Structures are given as C-alpha cells and as structure tokens.
Amino acid sequence: MATHIEDVTSLLFYEDLSDVVLVGNSYAGMVITGVAAKEPRRLAHIVYFDAYVPFEGENEMSLWPPLEQTRVKAEIAKANRFRPLPPNFPAFLGISDLKLAEWVQARLTPHPISTYEDPPPLGGPESASVPRSFINCTEGPFGAPLFATFASRAWKLGWKVYELKAGHAAMLTHPRESADILLRIASG
C-alpha cells in the first residue's frame, strides 16, 4: 500500500497539482486516506466511491467479515499468496455487458498481500480538515452489504453521503450518473 500511496503523492508533487478532488473506489479508500495524510494541502476534497473508510490501525483485511478473514489468512499461510479473482468477477461487480466484462477481466490482477495487511497512515488535524464525501452504491452482491457499513461510518463522521443505484463498478456501468455526483461534489 505504501507504494500505491507514494505513486499518488508523487504525481501530486511532480505535476504540482493543487485543489485536487481525489476519488478512490473499493481498496483505494485505503490509498486516498494515506494520500490525505501525506499531502493534505494539495487536496480540495476526498471522495470515497463505495470504498473502505479506515480508522486508526485498521487494515483492509480487518474490515472483512470474520469468516472471510480466517479463510484468506489460512490461504496465505498455506500458499503465501491470495487467490486470484474468479473468472466471473465482473458479474459479481454488477457488470452485465459482455464487452465491458471482458475488458475488466483482462485488467484484473491480484493485490500484493501487504495491501490487505498494512493500515494506511491517517495523518493529523490538517489531514482531517480535508472535506470528505462518500458515494454508496446500493446494488449488487459485492459492494452493497460491505460498503454500506462504510457509508454509515461516513454519515456518522458528518460527511455528505450520496446514494447511487448501481453495483460496485458504477463508474463503468453508470458513468453518467457517477460523473454527475462527482461534479456536484467538486462544485461544492
């Protein structure tokens, strides 16, 4: 995860970007949290798009249901790797269009184990002052039950929470609706 955070913070620095609306989907909620800890002055807003919202010391795996944690830890201990994504994973994400599903499947890769085990840095008061929003995708078997937990967490933190009637890959299946919400957030 540190590499993913560094990639984004380096882009912000070397391109001298400021007033950035940084958006992260799913696992990338961990990454954007770490980016906000390291480069808060460059960010205008952070958007958790059906994404993990970690608290201090939480890694991605700690946010999964206990049975899934146990299964994955056993698999890692046995094979020192985490299972590749199943061939039907795009459908699981709510992608029913065959061409889009093939496009997504060709680009899916397993994460390094450390991305599941390392907690992101949260930063201090300056990081916490960056405005944040959450987009809650309400349909589909993958995201809806898990990420609704983080929509609730965001709401309790006082963030603006938007609902999108789409699956976890809404930016691909519902691009116009996704863009409309992001533009509303960016315009304040």
Task: Give each language-model segment a name.
Residues 106-125:
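Active-site nucleophile elbow and catalytic-triad environment of alpha/beta-hydrolase enzymes
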Residues 128, 134-136:
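Short beta-strand/loop motif that positions the catalytic acidic residue
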